[in-house]
Amino acid sequence: MDVKEFDRRYCEGFNDQQLAAVHAEEGAVLLLAVPGSGKTTVLIARLGYLILCQGVDPAKILTMTYTVAATGEMRRRFGARFGEEYGKAMTISTINSLAMKIIGYYARNYGRRAAFTQVEDKEAVRILGQIYREVNRDFATEAAIRDLRTAITYVKNQMLTPEELEEADLGVDHLPEIYGKYNEALRAMGRMDYDDQMTYAYTILKGYPGVLDHFRRQFTHICVDESQDTSR
């Protein structure tokens, strides 16, 4: 399909900046706009453009978004606009789901165990409650646990070094000690949390070029929706 026909059929009402984002062919493209301005609509159009105008194999496209619900909604919207066949061929995934694919590939192909299983939410709360009581000699309130989990997520997502953690002021007393004990408890139980999935996958990609090359060959185009919600 030529570009003019594609724009007529699928990009009606798009402004020049939106069209430029859809048509971009080389390098990285970042689309910044206020909520509700149509970023996801533009992303869906770009996916269609890559397939219909550029001849990209949909199996070579990875689209990531923030929640499981959002992946289902994007697949539905793309399928309604461009056909379910293309939508089924594409990988539309959360970041955590992609991380588990990377971890699984590493485990299967490098003779490693798949490391850890996912810690349940209630289990994580229980572990943190026990550690909090041990360190503070007091019972943790719901607010204290919530603040702890927020701080731990920040530390893991930002991949802070022990030195950076010591210097960080995240509003939680004894955070370095609690953080260390929490991770020790998870390892002893063979568990990891959602944030561990991403940092573990990142470490694998950095340390094992063969794994990185595999996913680079598998996906020639990567699109990220709601990228403002991702960490570094």
Regions found by a protein language model. Name each.
Residues K60-T150, E166:
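Conserved P-loop NTPase-based nucleic-acid remodeling module centered on helicase motor cores
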